Structure formats: C-alpha cells, structure tokens
Amino acid sequence: MSKIYDVIVLGAGPSGLTAGLYAGRSRLSTLIIEKGQDGGQIAITNEIENYPGQQLEGESGPSLIARMTEQAKKFGAERVSDVIKSVELTGDVKKLIGNKGEYLAKTVIIATGAFPRPIGCKKIGRASCR
C-alpha cells in the first residue's frame, strides 16, 4: 500500500514550493510533485527585482528557486518528478495517479502555475520568442 501523505503539492514553482515548505515546517508529511524543472515561469527570469518580503537586487530566477527548493527539503518536504494523469479528490484520502505510480494524501494543493498560451493569430509563431 502507498504511503498516505498529509499534504501533496502539485507544482514546484514559487507557490508550490512555498506551500511545501510551510507544510513541512508544520511537521506534516509532504510530497511535492513536479512534471518538469522546479521554478515554473520564474526559472526563466534573468533578474528578479520584486519579490514579496525580500530584497533581491540582481538575483536570478534559478538561484531563488534553488534556495526555495533547498528550504522545502530542509523542512522535510519530499519531491518527485512525475506527470499526474488523473485525480480522485473525493473522500478522506485523495488519490493521484501518475506515470510513475499512485500517490495518496489527506490534502492536495494544486499550484500548477502559469504557462504561455497561443492567442490564435496565424503568424504568432514568428514573433512569440522575441
């Protein structure tokens, strides 16, 4: 039988890592599941000028995310890489089914973040990376 976590966080961007950090800090068994690299949109940011509660002059997105990931780990949050295919959020124990296995939790936090969406313009491909 799979371990039942107190909290599973879907997504390891700034919001997901913060949720995982505070859940772990509260001594809740915590698992962070991310399909790609940690950081989401902030991982591709060269310089962060404004972040709540921090003075981060000249810090890059990847360095901030590395610190956040390390803090979450320090407070006991586990992390796995997987793509979640389906979820069952009814009942006391929630079930998430991914490519690599099944995950169980009392609480699920969805922090899947933002991603660019095409606007439907035929010629957008030429200009989208400028």
Question: What is the meaning of each model-derived region?
Answer:
Residues 6, 35-37, 63-65, 109:
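Short low-complexity stretches enriched in small and charged residues
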